[in-house]
């Protein structure tokens, strides 16, 4: 006779691989075989429950001995989840993910029977009351994620039995009082996330017993004074986040005992003086985030002891002089962000010792001359941001030695001549952004040697002729942005060799005829944006071969007839935008095959009758926009079946608020974002 472990293993194999239902029935009802394998009726009940579980949640688990169950984004009550989980008896379950957007009541957690559960995620829900945690049996819990809920009160943490807890995430709630933390028994805690709350008094952390704490986030609260940090006993702290507060003085950093600190994030505060960094003992610091402050003087960096620094962000400050960079000892520097300052002179870069630099951001400054780039020793540079500066030519790019460059951003500069790119040696380049430059001629693209290019941004220029695209060698291209130009003829798309193209944007041009789309070879296309043109006829959509299309933007055209949608083969469609047209009849929606659609924009048309909405099969629909039409009768919303609807726009129609008051009240309660009003745009 086989032992129980082997018999259950055999049962697992059978349920995973045997597709013949007759064999399953024979196995189930053959008592002799049952006895031989020592399989009990409870085992079968578990497997029956597993089938129901899979069906209910539209998933496919084949084994009850799994360690992780992911039910993210599933619209289902928690008590039903717990019921099935207990029925199936997932004895090995260690990780349960329930980030669904729908859960508000978690009282059923008291019934949970998973002794090995280590991770419970309930983030991005509507939970406000967590007192049930006092009664749950999760002694092995190590990670509890409750971020982005409506929690304001956390006193229950004093009573929970989570002695093995290592990570507690309360980010993005409404918590103001954290005094209970001095009473909790979380001696193993390594990560505490408290950002995006309403905390002003964080000094209580002076009394907590978190000797193993490695990560502390207090960003986006209402903290102005950080002097309490010197009393914190967090000797193992590696990451400290204090961003988006009202901090002005950081002198306390000279007295804190965070010798192992690797990341300090104090961006978006009101800091102007950073001279105290000279006396800070963060020898292990790797990342320093100081952007969006009021810093003008950075000479202190010559004296700091941050020899391991890899990332420094100084963007959006008041810095003019960066000459100190030639004196700093940041040999491991990989990312330097200096965008949105008042920098005019970057010649100092020639003398810097940033041999490992991978990312350099100089955008949105008053820089007129970038010729020094020819002399810098940035052989490992991968990303270069030069947008919105005042250079009148890019000739130096023919001479730079950035052979590993992957991303180059040159939008909004003072030249429309990009011919120098023909001689640039950027063989690894994958992203090129040259939009908003008044470019008219793109013939230079034929001669560039960017064979690995995946993303090309040519939007917001003055391009009329795109025929050169038939001659370019961009076989890896996945994203092409041509919006907001003067393009009227797109016939060249038939001849281009962009077999991997996934995103094509052509909105904001002058195209009226899109029949060429029937002949293009974009089998991997996921997003097509041709809104804001002069299109009236979309019958070609019946013939296109865009079987993977997920997003279609037809907005702001002259379309009145959408009946062709009945015949299109867009089974993956998730987002359809046809607003700002002349559509009055939407009865075709009953016949379309958009089972996966999540967003439908029909706003600002001439629609009166929406009764077809009760007949459509849009079970995944989350956003429906009907505002700015001529709708007066909204009673159809008593019958529609959109279980996941979160956003409904009905404002700027002819709906009478008084006669529909009850229905409006119901929809306002049921739908997260519901807008309505009486008048139409034409009134």
Regions found by a protein language model. Give the residues of each.
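N-terminal Skp1-binding subsegment of the F-box domain
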Residues: 1-29
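A structural signal for leucine-rich repeat
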Residues: 85-89, 107-114, 131-138, 155-162, ...
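LRR N-terminal entry segment and analogous cap-like coil->beta motifs
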Residues: 20-24, 31-118
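Leucine-rich solenoid repeat scaffolds
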Residues: 18, 632-683
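Conserved hydrophobic beta-strand positions in leucine-rich repeat
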Residues: 67-71, 96-98, 118-122, 141-146, ...
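Conserved "Asn-ladder"/turn position within leucine-rich repeats
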Residues: 74-76, 101, 125, 149, ...
């Amino acid at each position: 006779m086989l032992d129980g472990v082997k018999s259950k293993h055999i049962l697992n194999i059978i349920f995973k691989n045997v597709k013949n239902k007759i064999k399953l029935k024979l196995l189930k009802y053959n008592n002799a075989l049952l006895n031989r394998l020592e399989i009990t009726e409870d085992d079968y009940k578990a497997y029956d429950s597993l089938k129901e579980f899979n069906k209910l949640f539209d998933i496919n688990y084949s084994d009850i001995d799994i360690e992780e169950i992911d039910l993210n984004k599933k619209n289902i009550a928690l008590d039903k989840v717990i019921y099935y989980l207990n029925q199936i008896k997932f004895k090995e379950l260690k990780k349960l993910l329930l980030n669904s957007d729908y859960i508000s009541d978690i009282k059923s957690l008291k019934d949970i029977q998973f002794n090995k559960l280590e991770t419970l995620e309930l983030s991005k829900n509507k939970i406000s009351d967590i007192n049930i945690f006092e009664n749950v049996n999760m002694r092995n819990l190590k990670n509890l994620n409750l971020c982005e809920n409506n929690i304001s009160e956390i006193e229950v943490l004093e009573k929970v039995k989570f002695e093995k807890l290592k990570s507690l995430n309360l980010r993005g709630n409404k918590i103001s009082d954290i005094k209970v933390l001095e009473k909790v028994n979380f001696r193993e805690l390594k990560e505490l996330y408290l950002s995006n709350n309403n905390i002003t008094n964080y000094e209580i952390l002076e009394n907590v017993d978190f000797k193993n704490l490695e990560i502390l986030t207090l960003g986006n609260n209402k903290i102005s004074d950080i002097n309490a940090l010197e009393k914190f006993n967090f000797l193992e702290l590696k990451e400290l986040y204090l961003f988006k507060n009202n901090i002005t003085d950081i002198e306390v950093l000279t007295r804190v005992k965070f010798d192992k600190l690797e990341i300090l994030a104090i961006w978006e505060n009101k800091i102007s003086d950073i001279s105290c960094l000279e006396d800070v003992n963060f020898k292990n610091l790797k990342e320093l985030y100081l952007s969006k402050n009021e810093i003008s003087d950075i000479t202190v960096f010559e004296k700091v002891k941050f020899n391991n620094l890899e990332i420094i962000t100084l963007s959006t400050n008041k810095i003019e002089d960066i000459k100190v960079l030639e004196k700093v000892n940041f040999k491991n520097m990989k990312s330097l962000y200096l965008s949105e300052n008042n920098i005019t002179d970057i010649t100092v870069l020639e003398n810097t010792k940033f041999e490992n630099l991978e990312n350099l951001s100089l955008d949105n400054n008053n820089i007129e001359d970038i010729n020094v780039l020819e002399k810098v020793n940035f052989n490992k540079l991968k990303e270069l941001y030069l947008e919105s500066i005042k250079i009148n030519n890019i000739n130096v790019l023919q001479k730079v030695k950035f052979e590993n460059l992957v991303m180059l951003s040159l939008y909004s500069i003072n030249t429309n001549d990009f011919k120098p790119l023909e001689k640039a040696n950027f063989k690894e380049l994958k992203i090129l952004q040259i939009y908003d430059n008044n470019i008219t001629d793109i013939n230079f693209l034929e001669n560039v040697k960017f064979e690995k290019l995946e993303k090309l941004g040519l939007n917001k220029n003055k391009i009329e002729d795109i025929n050169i695209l038939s001659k370019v060698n961009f076989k890896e291209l996945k994203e092409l942005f041509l919006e907001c130009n003067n393009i009227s003829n797109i016939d060249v798309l038939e001849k281009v060799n962009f077999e991997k193209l996934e995103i094509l944007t052509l909105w904001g041009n002058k195209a009226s005829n899109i029949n060429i789309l029937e002949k293009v070879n974009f089998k991997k296309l996921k997003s097509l944006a041709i809104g804001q043109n002069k299109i009236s006829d979309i019958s070609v959509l019946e013939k296109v071969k865009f079987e993977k299309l997920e997003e279609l933007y037809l907005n702001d055209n002259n379309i009145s007839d959408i009946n062709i949608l009945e015949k299109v083969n867009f089974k993956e469609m998730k987002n359809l935008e046809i607003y700002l047209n002349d559509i009055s009849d939407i009865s075709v929606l009953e016949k379309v095959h958009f089972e996966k659609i999540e967003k439908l924009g029909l706003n600002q048309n001439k629609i009166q009758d929406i009764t077809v909405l009760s007949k459509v099969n849009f079970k995944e629909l989350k956003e429906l926009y009907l505002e700015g039409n001529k709708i007066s009768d909204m009673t159809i919303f008593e019958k529609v079946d959109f279980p996941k609807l979160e956003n409904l726009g009905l404002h700027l129609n002819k709906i009478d608020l008084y006669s529909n008051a009850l229905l409006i009240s119901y929809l306002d309660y049921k739908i997260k974002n519901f807008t309505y009003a009486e008048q139409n745009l034409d009134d």
